[in-house]
């Protein structure tokens, strides 16, 4: 099944056109087209090795693509790298924390490297979380270190935030705190975020758009609510009325092969009742991701 892209006609804060990247024989990105709406929080979801980190690194001008182009807030990072990077805040999975320095000295280090860095803004974000500025950074918990990395990114007052699996090593409470600080900042600043994760349940409460990346290709790109509304799940091959098969995977408990179906967007409301009558269940976002990844692998199976 090809890429499925939901309707989007607004302004893109981050755009990729025909983006491809290869590492020797491995295709990391395969003709990726992506438009992240301004003011949105977009979830970039896919398994390890899907190309999520490569996509973010190309957008940051850390990796040069083999073909295609990128625009960050209207600026090509490969033609105007300095200007583009001033518009981007970057949060890697493992933030660069200087363990021998205090939290505040880490912020001062960031200020010395970024001319527009707002150190007071970052301090306020950390103080909201009761993280002492005089604490040695090497003694921070994993969640606190992640918050420090986010505070550094937010201190740039960037219009676009790129977050590469920042929740991967956090416990549930730390994840919740991280998401809350991120959303507060986005609402107050009017910025845009692309938040990558290999677990959709980690990010579904924070995001309003879902992009599924598998095998270097975008498998689905649509508003989060549309992904929920237009997909159904059955344990049989017979389709719900007006539905198209997406992919099949082994369901929870390993007892049944489940099939994900997509209803036509314009008939989703009417199709819901018919789908339920035909024995179809609501599909969770995890089910949606599994179905599209299974279709992309061409095997028909994606173990849950």
What are these regions (language model features)?
Residues 45-47:
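The feature captures the beta-strand-to-loop junction immediately N-terminal to the Walker
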Residues 68-76, 83-84:
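Conserved ABC transporter NBD signature motif
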């Amino acid at each position: 099944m090809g890429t499925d892209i939901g309707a989007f006609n607004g302004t893109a804060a981050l755009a990729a056109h025909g983006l491809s990247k290869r590492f020797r024989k491995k295709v990391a990105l395969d003709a990726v087209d992506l438009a992240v709406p301004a003011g949105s929080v977009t979830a970039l979801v896919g398994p390890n090795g899907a190309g999520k980190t490569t996509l973010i690194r190309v957008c940051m001008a850390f990796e040069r693509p083999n073909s295609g182009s990128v625009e960050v807030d209207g600026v090509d990072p490969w033609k105007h790298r300095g200007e583009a990077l001033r518009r981007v805040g970057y949060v890697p999975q493992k933030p660069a924390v200087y363990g021998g320095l205090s939290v505040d000295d880490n912020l001062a280090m960031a200020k010395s490297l970024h001319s527009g860095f707002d150190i007071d803004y970052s301090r306020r974000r950390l103080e909201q979380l009761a993280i002492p500025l005089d604490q040695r950074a090497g003694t921070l918990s994993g969640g606190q270190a992640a918050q420090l990395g986010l505070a550094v990114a937010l201190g740039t007052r960037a219009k676009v935030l790129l977050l590469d699996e920042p929740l991967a090593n956090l416990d549930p409470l730390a994840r919740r705190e991280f998401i809350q600080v991120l959303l507060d900042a986005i609402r107050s600043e009017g910025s845009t975020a692309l938040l990558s994760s290999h677990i959709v349940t980690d990010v579904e409460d924070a995001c309003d758009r879902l992009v599924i990346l598998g095998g270097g290709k975008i498998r689905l790109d649509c508003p989060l609510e549309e992904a929920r509304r237009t997909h159904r799940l059955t344990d049989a091959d017979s389709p719900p009325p007006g539905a198209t098969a997406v992919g099949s995977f082994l369901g929870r408990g390993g007892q049944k092969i489940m099939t994900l179906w997509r209803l036509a967007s314009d008939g989703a409301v009417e199709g819901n009742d018919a789908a339920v009558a035909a024995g179809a269940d609501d599909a969770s976002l995890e089910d949606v991701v599994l179905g599209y990844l299974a279709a992309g692998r061409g095997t028909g199976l994606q173990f849950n």
